[in-house]
Amino acid sequence: MIVDFLSRDVGEENFGALIESYIIHNALRDKVLQMKNISLFCPNFYEEINFVEDGVEVFLNNKNILKSKLLLACDGRFSRLRDKFQIHTTTKNYEQIAIVFNIKHQKPHENIAWEKFLPGGPLAILPLKNQHHSSIVWIAPKLDSQAIIELDQENFMHQLHKKTENCVGEIEIISEKFSYPLIMVAAKKFYHEKMLLVGDAACGVHPIAGQGLNLGLESIKILQELIKQYFLSGLEINSQILIENYNKKAQKSARKMVIATDVLNSLFESQSLAIGLARDLGLGLVNRLPKLKKFFIKNAGGF
């Protein structure tokens, strides 16, 4: 069964953009270097962090001491800052591995992203800027993943062609393959003293819906709006009320995404005939009911 989501269904020219991470990193770094009110301390690292009455002090290995109203922990799903201050987490190991690489292909992708839900796990074909280049995210059971990665080129390509079902024609791999385990990690609270968890440090979800970066950006948006609101009202941007408001709003946003991605993965991973029939019925309804389809598009795309 094929379910298609089109941007015109919600009156938009497109859903958004698929951008390789190194491009985003380089653009952000260039922007930071242009900002006169931002100082970059890299590759320095912290040796000690103290919370004081009016904020936080960070002692760096180069003997600099940074003082701030707030400290943002943006150090990823396996955050050392989160662990340092003993913020407990809920975790779920999906016993799956994501294998990621770029391909060159015969047919133009026409800016269409495909996600194929197949026995053993989904495979996503994500269009890049070049019409004949795409990124592959191949999700496989942990038990099978090493055998897949270690396949010789001929057998790996044979398996890949079977999974893509010729939707982009002949394929050539044009990058290194890398893999990572799929583990959901959600902090039980998104703060400690004057430190806030942001992005994957707060919550990292299953990539099945491609919403990990968007969830991180949403936490930044929530914090930015709260800081602006409190600053314009003449209130301290590190007040306990702001911190608790951020925790409440960001956790609510993250909780919805954790549930959605977890349920979606379970539905397509299940071998149960009853669940399979219910899943196919649900997908059929999405295709036949425009309002239901719009609901999914708007929630995924942030429209």
Predicted features, each with a name:
Residues 64, 70-170, 175-177:
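Conserved FAD-binding catalytic core of PHBH/FMO-like flavoproteins
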Residues 52, 119, 128, 191-192:
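Structural motif
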Residues 17-22, 150, 217, 272:
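Short, solvent-exposed loop/helix junctions and linker helices
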Residues 4-11, 139-141, 261-264:
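Short glycine/proline- and charge-enriched loop/turn segments
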Residues 225-303:
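C-terminal helical "tail/cap" subdomain of flavin- and related membrane-associated enzymes
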Residues 21-25, 29, 96, 100, ...:
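A general structural signal for well-ordered alpha-helical segments in protein cores
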Residues 1-84, 92-97:
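Conserved N-terminal helical subregion
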Residues 146-231, 237-240:
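FAD/FMN-dependent oxidoreductases across multiple families
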